[in-house]
Curated annotation (Swiss-Prot):
Its main location: membrane. Keywords: Bacterial flagellum biogenesis, Bacterial flagellum protein export, Cell membrane, GTP-binding, Membrane, Nucleotide-binding, Protein transport, Transport. GO terms for cellular component: plasma membrane. InterPro entries: AAA+_ATPase (IPR003593), FlhF (IPR020006), FlhF__GTPase_dom (IPR047040), P-loop_NTPase (IPR027417), SRP54_GTPase_dom (IPR000897). The gene is flhF. This is Flagellar biosynthesis protein FlhF. It comes from Pseudomonas aeruginosa (strain ATCC 15692 / DSM 22644 / CIP 104116 / JCM 14847 / LMG 12228 / 1C / PRS 101 / PAO1). Necessary for flagellar biosynthesis. May be involved in translocation of the flagellum.
């Protein structure tokens, strides 16, 4: 039997290593968590099970003799007088070990849960590993069956994967065109369904007016997007009805950027210091038709971020908060940003850095899943030219144009199918 150990960052990568080296017939003997990932033990070519042992007549004779002697001793013990039996019980009682002290009992009681906890943790890890193994195997089987039974659907799956769309969004889209026989027609219908799934505001937020804040992680492009929106507004409505507000006193030079923008556009700028009431800061701007707020991109664990989000969520202010998402970010980064900033109440999102993005599927999928209207698309550094009001069909067309040129690998497709078997809590991540 050939036994090997494999090391990888996660279970799926480890399974890929096993399949590549030992083939699909390899058996998984065990898995455990190690520094940096997973250790998987796999084997190939199990030896045949050992043949059953032959009967040993001599041993059977000795066993029968021993059994007879035990029966004789038991009968003799039963026939002995009661007094002798009482003395024997006393003798045996003296030989019993002493009862543990209270301190020893307490120590043992505390030790048991610790061992139990360690055992439960080990069992939990083993179960998680088994679940991931099952997911990988099911994904591989399901993908293989789809290619064999429905090659057209498999081709559409590949195209959606090239766009960066996750399995949980691709599956319902493909179900809508499952009965369409022509591949080209099915693809056009699929993109139409995808376009309808992308929500956009009925009215340009700048035309609607009010108080609008841009929130999101550091580096998403909040300040640059705010500058584009401010310039766009001034060109259409003039500078008299616009005011700029900066809540970013943490990043070096952030407020200076807003001040410079205000001077260029001839627009008043209000700086909100930490601890200052946002309600009081906005009170003098009540007559302005449009107020744009730039916020700080702080770590999710920073208490200052919680205070900032609570201020923006105040019902008395009626702030429309838009999540700024860089389309260059990974799916997990986008999901984490949404989970952090959703607490302030999001009116929609703005997608930035489209000119640098490798795909748009991840950001589109988040907007669709969370029902976030996509307000604007920012695709360059020019102010205000590189900011467009979002149109769902244009966004989908751009996503198609950015799809990866190469076909996804079989392992990538199997892994995507494996995601369909994950528990909802794990998919949410």
């Amino acid at each position: 039997m050939q036994v090997k150990r494999f090391f990888a960052a996660d279970m799926r990568q480890a399974m890929k290593l096993v399949r590549d080296e030992l083939g699909p017939d390899a058996a998984i003997l065990g898995n455990r968590r190690v520094a940096g990932g997973i250790e998987l033990t796999a084997a190939l070519d199990y030896q045949a099970p050992p043949a059953p042992s032959k009967p040993n007549p001599a041993l059977e004779v000795e066993l029968r003799k021993t059994q007879a002697r035990i029966a004789e001793a038991r009968a003799e013990l039963t026939a002995r007088p009661a007094e002798t039996q009482r003395k024997d019980r006393q003798l045996f009682a003296e030989e019993k070990p002493a009862r543990p002290t209270l301190a020893e009992s307490m120590t043992a009681a505390h030790a048991k849960p610790q061992v139990g906890g360690q055992t439960l943790e080990a069992m939990r890890f083993e179960l998680n590993g088994l679940r991931e193994l099952i997911e990988v195997q099911l994904g591989s089987i399901a993908w293989g069956q789809l290619q064999h039974q429905r090659p057209q659907q498999a081709n559409l799956w590949r195209r959606l994967q090239r766009m960066g769309l996750p399995a949980e969004l691709s599956k319902p889209l493909l179900e809508r065109v499952a009965a369409v026989g022509d591949t080209r027609q099915a693809w056009r219908m699929l993109l139409a369904h995808l376009s309808r799934a992308v929500q956009t505001p009925e009215q340009d937020p700048l035309d609607a007016g009010g108080v609008l804040a841009l929130v999101g992680p550091a580096g998403a492009g909040k300040t640059t997007t705010l500058a584009k929106m401010a310039a766009r507004y001034v060109l259409k409505y003039g500078a008299q009805s616009l005011a700029l507000v900066s809540m970013d006193s943490y990043r070096i030079g952030a407020q200076e950027q807003i001040k410079t923008l205000g001077r260029i556009l001839n627009v008043p700028v209000t700086l909100v210091d930490p601890g200052q009431s946002l309600i009081q800061a906005l009170a003098p701007l009540a007559r302005k038709r449009m107020v744009l707020i730039d916020t700080a991109g702080l770590p999710a664990s920073d208490p200052a971020l919680r205070m900032q989000l609570e201020a923006l969520a105040s019902p008395s202010l009626n702030v429309k908060n838009y999540l700024v998402m860089a389309t260059t970010s990974q799916s997990q980064v986008l999901k984490s940003a949404y989970q952090t900033y959703r607490h302030c109440g999001l009116a929609g999102c703005i997608l930035t850095k489209l000119d640098e993005a490798g795909s748009l599927g991840e950001s589109m999928a988040l907007a669709i899943a969370q029902r976030l209207p996509v307000a604007y698309l920012a695709d360059g550094p020019r102010i205000p030219d590189d900011l467009q009001v979002a149109r769902s069909h244009q966004l989908v067309s751009r996503a198609v144009s950015l799809q990866a040129p190469e076909e996804p690998s079989e392992d990538a497709m199997a892994e995507m199918f494996a995601g369909l078997y994950q528990q909802p809590a794990r998919r949410a991540g």
